[in-house]
Amino acid sequence: MSNITIGVIGYGYWGPNIVRNFFNAPNCTVKAVADGRPERLAVLAKVFPSINGVKTGDEIINDKEIDAVVVATPVYTHFALAKKALENGKHVLIEKP
């Protein structure tokens, strides 16, 4: 099985759990996590120093090395982020609901 490179948008309530699970999953590499709050990216850097913290979801969506995007942001942002990721050829997982 080949490796899949993942980017996560949102490191608030569910983001840390999603990152942890994909980080520990075989054949997965979490390359980047996007969050607009610097304090959340600081926590990410302490817990997962090998993962790049970025400020916007667009940085993840436009990254040619990322195969799949997890959208773990407030519900009202899901459609726009998922649509943009799909239009850029990414696989998408949207955190419920």
Predicted regions and their residues:
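Beta-loop-alpha module in the N-terminal Rossmann-like domain of NAD(P)-dependent dehydrogenases
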Residues: 48-97
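N-terminal Rossmann-like dinucleotide-binding module
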Residues: 1-48
